[in-house]
Amino acid sequence: MSNKLEQLRKLTTVVADTGEIDAIKKYQPEDATTNPSLILKAAQIAEYAPLIDASIEYAKTQSDDKAQQIQDTCDMLAVNIGKEILKTIPGRISTEVDARLSYDMEGSVAKARQLVKMYNDAGITNDRILIKLASTWEGIRAAEILEKEGINCNLTLLFSFAQARACAEAGVFLISPFVGRIMDWYKAKEGRDFEAQEDPGVLSVTKIYNYYKEYGYKTVVMGASFRNIGEILELAGCDRLTIAPALLAELEAAEGEVVEKLVDSKGAAERPAPMTHAEFLWEHNQDPMAVEKLAEGIRNFAVDQGKLEAMIAAKL
């Protein structure tokens, strides 16, 4: 019998949640996802030093203002890392918009267009790029605009059903509902561990997946943020799963049958009217876990973006 990673690939598109080229070459995923924390981690690897240098040189040609140079270097570094990753995968790279723009629709749209232009200028076409945005109301509205321009988006930091519903109604290409971070919250609150089949993060993604399929939404569901392979295996059959290298290694080393847990019902039920802004805020606010985790996720990504900028500033 083949290992669990090989079996999972037959049911689900496997995506690598990393910016590290060696790991991507090893596990040969379809796609790869990055975020500010992963870019910061990758930037500290020696083999990426030339990419940082090239990004700084680019920034110096764009502006004499140091603050602007730092911004341009960070953007180009994310794109340069993305370009390297695209050499090793057949699919798409997800590159994230600065988390500090999470509540700024116009700023998010402008930054996304800038990142896509950087990729396009390097010969990378839009069908190989996903722009990551936080699943705030403003982020979802930004994605709605970008999708109409042919820029596909990956809506991340998704913790509530309200966020998932709003994303589908906006016609976004893909969502990344988080699993492990949801479980973390409930584990801390209830003081207990959860079996994979009762894991609150697993149940959240399952509910979202079934809802999308029931109403025939085309938005791709890509489970993210896993703490163990049990969570991953409970979501076998999900459209895509983005998995960190350590868990890919664990799946590769594991023997035993992988059972399809999520099945597309191919429904075509009449869809409810799209949520208003007020309805979205009210429904999202009913979920204290989601409110806390969305805010925390944005803050943490912003902190790591700041660390990356400090690292770049020291090199300018």
UniProtKB/Swiss-Prot annotation:
Pathway where this protein functions: Carbohydrate degradation; pentose phosphate pathway; D-glyceraldehyde 3-phosphate and beta-D-fructose 6-phosphate from D-ribose 5-phosphate and D-xylulose 5-phosphate (non-oxidative stage): step 2/3
The enzyme's E.C. designation: 2.2.1.2
Superkingdom in the source lineage: Bacteria
Record's catalysed reaction(s): D-sedoheptulose 7-phosphate + D-glyceraldehyde 3-phosphate = D-erythrose 4-phosphate + beta-D-fructose 6-phosphate
Keyword field: Cytoplasm, Pentose shunt, Schiff base, Transferase
One cellular-component annotation, GO: cytosol
Subcellular location(s) per record: Cytoplasm
A GO term for molecular function: transaldolase activity
Pfam families (UniProt xref): TAL_FSA
GO biological process, one term: carbohydrate metabolic process
Keyword presence, Metal-binding: no
Entry annotation: catalytic residues: 132
InterPro entries, per database record: Aldolase_TIM, TAL/FSA, Transaldolase_1, Transaldolase_AS
Principal subcellular localisation of the protein: cytoplasm
Top-level EC class as recorded in UniProt: transferase
Function: Transaldolase is important for the balance of metabolites in the pentose-phosphate pathway.
Assembly, per entry: Homodimer.
Record-stated family: Belongs to the transaldolase family. Type 1 subfamily.
Name of the protein in its database record: Transaldolase
Taxonomic source organism: Vibrio vulnificus (strain YJ016)
